[in-house]
Amino acid sequence: MKHYCNPMNLEYRYQFFRRPNQSGKNDLYKVYREAADPTLIAFKGLYYLFPSMTAGFFTSEDLHDWNYYRLGNEIPVYDYAPDVRVMGDYMYFSASRNGENGSFYRTKDPRTEAFERIPATFPFWDPNLFIDDDGRVYFYWGCSNMEPIYGVELDSKTMQPVTEKQVMIRSHEDVRGYERFGEEHVAPHTDADIEEQVENMISMMKDQAKEEGAELPLPEEQVKAQLRGYFSNRPYIEGAWMTKHEGRY
């Protein structure tokens, strides 16, 4: 058995966020490393690695030496948490798209051919495609402290749902202590703390929008409602990944 070093020696990108209410010329940006949420598959004799925000993918014959390939404009290269799966002769790609319907993309060789788009009919975040041994196709998604992990069966040719979406996993922090935020599983934020965070964030968002000559993306009360959920003490349920081993899902 071979063992491989982690972290891997790969180039990755940075993301620069402009700070609202800058305190000085040397404090204009926050800098974040990227290339999270990787999917790794074996496809036609090569390993393929697709990380977030990399605008491309890596290939390797041995999991040690990697080559980078840039993705084309036909695919949403900056959508987070790309999921890549093999179905027949094709590699299928999807990535996170909230607020509008996502799509699936497929190709027989991403190094030399463009991806073909297959429109989807619903939005999703943190997607995971699963092809069962009998050829039936299932799709899972979710990344929220307000929504559960969902699942749905898809038509293998059209990639359209053939069932209604089903709730797979919900948080139950009221009965499962390990799901609770905070040291010693004690909620770290009071209602007053949460409201203060919401007001601070709204103020920052308004300042940034004003600088850019824009408006808030939604009415202020809707934004506040979303922020209250974001800053709440509820745990995030995310990163769905279905696999099958010795007959067990």
Give, region by region, the residue ranges found by the protein language model.
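Carbohydrate-active catalytic/glycan-binding domains of CAZyme proteins
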Residues: M1-Y249
